[in-house]
């Protein structure tokens, strides 16, 4: 459910239910003012924030992939290569630079299974604490060690060195592709991979940090990943919704914008689907 206030002389309230929320979802502030939303909840769990260490990245990635395929109850599972260890300064005792890591949030009832899986995969658990214990120890929670938080860990220390990419891998996921990419790009890209699901299927993402050289080199890498590897790149270096992730104009969003923001005042230039002549006179 979304409640939206329109941007016009006499604002109106529009309520969207069910699939109708797609008229405003992922619109980046272009489709009226959202003033209320309802969303589904599940019972809270006291997740175990864990780090598992492996001798090589392939082993870490295989562990996470298998755990997901076999439905280990985890809220987060992020595979982070050893070259990131230098940026996790509060975790030097748990993430040494000679090993690769998997950061996870594991359900309490799945911890024993998780520990056994790590051991069977040749890894070791270096950290396992509840959120309260993490806070007491002044350590970062697992969610600050994955997804784009990983990028931020590097940028905090080397802000002029790095940018990043957002990569969706083809399904079914082939770990050998990651090996080829890591070999191809060497020190240009530091990788971490995120376990996720889309449409009920396993989907692997990566948000590698990219050593900035030039715009031309950045887009050369993007082109290689798309054309050679079959990946989809959600470009974080562009302004519009379509050029970044959507890849095409969503007519549903544009039609709703005509209703909720008829003068085109909200976040102008964010979507290529809206043209100046569409604005109400």
Give the ranges of each region predicted by the language model.
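Conserved glycine-rich FAD pyrophosphate-binding loop
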Residues: 123-281
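C-terminal substrate-binding/cap subdomain adjacent to the FAD-binding core in PCMH-type
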Residues: 1-147
């Amino acid at each position: 459910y979304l409640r939206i206030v329109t941007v016009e002389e006499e604002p109106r309230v529009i309520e969207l239910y069910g699939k109708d929320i797609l008229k405003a979802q992922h619109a980046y502030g272009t489709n009226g003012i959202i003033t209320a939303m309802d969303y589904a909840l599940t019972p809270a769990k006291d997740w175990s924030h864990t780090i598992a260490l492996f001798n090589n990245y392939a082993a870490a990635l295989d562990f996470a992939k298998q755990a997901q395929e076999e439905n280990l109850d985890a809220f987060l599972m992020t595979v982070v290569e050893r070259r990131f260890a230098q940026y996790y300064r509060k975790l030097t005792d748990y993430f040494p630079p000679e090993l690769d890591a998997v950061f996870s949030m594991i359900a309490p009832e799945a911890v024993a299974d998780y520990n056994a899986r790590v051991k069977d995969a040749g890894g070791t658990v270096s950290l396992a604490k509840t959120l309260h214990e993490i806070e007491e120890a002044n350590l970062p929670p697992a969610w600050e060690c994955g997804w784009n938080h990983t990028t931020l860990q590097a940028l905090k220390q080397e802000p002029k060195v790095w940018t990043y990419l957002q990569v969706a891998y083809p399904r079914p996921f082939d770990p050998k592709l990651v090996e080829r990419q890591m070999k191809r790009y060497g020190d240009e890209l530091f990788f971490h991979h995120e376990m996720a699901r889309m449409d009920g299927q396993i989907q692997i993402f990566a948000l590698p940090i990219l050593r900035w050289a030039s715009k031309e080199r950045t887009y050369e890498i993007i082109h290689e990943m798309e054309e050679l590897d079959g990946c989809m790149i959600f470009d974080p270096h562009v302004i519009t919704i379509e050029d970044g992730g959507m890849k095409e104009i969503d007519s549903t969003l544009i039609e709703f914008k005509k209703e909720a923001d008829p003068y085109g005042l909200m976040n102008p230039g964010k979507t290529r689907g809206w043209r100046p002549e569409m604005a109400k006179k």
